[in-house]
């Protein structure tokens, strides 16, 4: 597949041919489930003829049906463009197809999608990751030049790692959330999934920057990073030793080999442990579900989306939500409502926010003395469908990504090897807030070393 950097140099005729080639591939690979709607049903022609970018199904594109992979939003057509879409259109990039996801971005496998699951292009028996599994699968399978996803607790980095792509989660507030279907407003962040580090940086540049329409967008000066990538710059990298040691044997072997290559290239590598990580999962799921409970209260069958049959207003609310939401979404709404209820708010939510502050301080302390943090993206490579049928087991698999969202830091997943089933292993690099340049420099160095 042509890279994003190459495609941006194409003539209008070459871009037209690329779009036709992608459309033919998408139809041929329909069983992969990377996309959720036939391209013919989308108003692609009205959105410009730029380089095609796949869009996760929770990002508003004017004239498109946007459902967050949920039955409750059946029939909803976006009346406006998200800010990231407007930015794409101004940079000779254009939306090209809706990618599958876990319902309302709640999951790590795409199995909770109303449209059905997406398959991992590397091995169809294994999950592609989530919640941006469709975006990652599309890029990995050559069905997209690059894609946009959203990351609340690893939803860009984990599927990118499982499918063998590069996934970048920007600093919280760096990319506008205006037009994103909200899951957890203090954690959500839109970012790119791409074939390589340079393409990820190019797409990041296209969507980043302050947006007055988004109250969570930070008014921090933005400077392009893709034209200043330096993979030869020597960096101080701190490895989270206990995270690497606790990964599966094949994941650990690939990560340790990557660490040795970083050392041999002249990077300064030190080791430390995260001592209090036992609170990460609990803090994340308390905060995320509490915010989800509030955000998803707007879906009631009255204003937009699917409306259930009912005899009165109460039945309309109950039936629309009961029939429209999937089991995982219902579970998280219930949990979030519980932790916000009288008598439990102080016991759970306030404590979770204190744990969040502690997690952020722990990251900041390490990054005071280092340029980057190195750790796994996931404890193992992509697991088989149904392997994590227990919700708690599934939540625990997010252990290496969720704390980065709690801290609001930028992070990237970079492929570093394969296991004996040809499944991808990725390393995760984390940088100081607003320092995506150092993050990309380190990722490019690692990518170069792995590719040789």
From Swiss-Prot:
Molecular function GO labels: ATP binding; glutaminyl-tRNA synthase (glutamine-hydrolyzing) activity
Keywords per UniProt: ATP-binding, Ligase, Nucleotide-binding, Protein biosynthesis
EC assignment: 6.3.5.7
Pfam family, one: Amidase
Superkingdom per UniProt: Bacteria
Enzyme class per UniProt: ligase
GO biological process: translation
PROSITE patterns for the chain: AMIDASES (PS00571)
Family, similarity comment: Belongs to the amidase family. GatA subfamily.
UniProt cross-references to NCBIfam families, sorted A to Z: gatA (TIGR00132)
Subunit structure: Heterotrimer of A, B and C subunits.
Protein name: Glutamyl-tRNA(Gln) amidotransferase subunit A
Organism: Campylobacter concisus (strain 13826)
């Amino acid at each position: 597949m042509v890279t994003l950097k190459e495609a941006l140099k194409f003539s209008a005729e070459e871009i037209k041919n690329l779009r036709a080639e992608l459309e033919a591939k998408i139809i041929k690979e329909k069983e992969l489930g990377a996309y959720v709607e036939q391209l013919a049903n989308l108003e692609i022609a009205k959105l410009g003829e730029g380089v095609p970018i796949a869009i996760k199904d929770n990002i508003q594109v004017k004239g498109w049906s946007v459902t967050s992979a949920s039955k409750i939003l059946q029939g909803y057509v976006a009346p406006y463009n998200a800010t990231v879409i407007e930015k794409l259109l101004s940079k000779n990039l254009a939306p090209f197809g809706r990618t599958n996801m876990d319902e309302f971005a709640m999951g790590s496998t795409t199995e909770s999608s109303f449209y059905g699951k997406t398959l991992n292009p590397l091995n169809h028996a294994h999950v592609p990751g989530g919640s941006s599994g469709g975006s990652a699968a599309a890029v990995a399978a050559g069905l997209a030049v690059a894609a946009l996803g959203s990351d609340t607790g690893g939803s860009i980095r984990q599927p990118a790692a499982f499918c063998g792509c590069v996934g970048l989660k920007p600093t919280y507030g760096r990319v506008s959330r205006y037009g994103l279907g909200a899951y957890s407003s203090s954690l959500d962040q839109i970012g790119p999934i791409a074939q390589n580090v340079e393409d990820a940086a190019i797409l990041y540049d296209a969507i980043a920057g302050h947006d007055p329409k988004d109250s969570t967008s930070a008014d921090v000066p933005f400077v392009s990073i893709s034209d200043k990538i330096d993979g030869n710059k020597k960096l101080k990298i701190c490895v989270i030793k206990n995270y690497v040691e606790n990964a599966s044997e094949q994941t650990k072997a690939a990560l340790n080999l990557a660490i040795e290559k970083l050392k041999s290239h002249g990077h300064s590598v030190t080791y430390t442990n995260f001592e209090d990580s036992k609170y990460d999962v609990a803090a994340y799921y308390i905060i995320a579900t509490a915010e989800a409970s509030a955000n998803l209260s707007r879906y009631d069958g009255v204003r937009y989306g699917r409306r259930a049959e009912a005899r009165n207003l109460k039945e309309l609310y109950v039936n629309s939500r009961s029939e429209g939401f999937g089991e995982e979404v219902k579970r998280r709404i219930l949990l979030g409502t519980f932790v916000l209820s009288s008598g439990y708010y102080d016991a759970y939510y306030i404590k979770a926010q204190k744990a969040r502050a502690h997690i952020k301080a722990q990251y900041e302390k390490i990054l005071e003395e280092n340029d980057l943090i190195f750790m796994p993206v996931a404890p193992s490579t992509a697991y088989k469908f149904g392997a994590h049928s227990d919700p708690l087991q599934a939540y625990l698999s997010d252990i290496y990504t969720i704390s980065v969202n709690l801290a609001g830091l930028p992070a990237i997943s970079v492929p570093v090897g394969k296991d004996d089933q040809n499944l991808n292993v990725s390393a995760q690099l984390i940088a100081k807030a607003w320092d995506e340049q150092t993050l990309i420099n380190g990722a490019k160095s690692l990518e170069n070393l792995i590719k040789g």
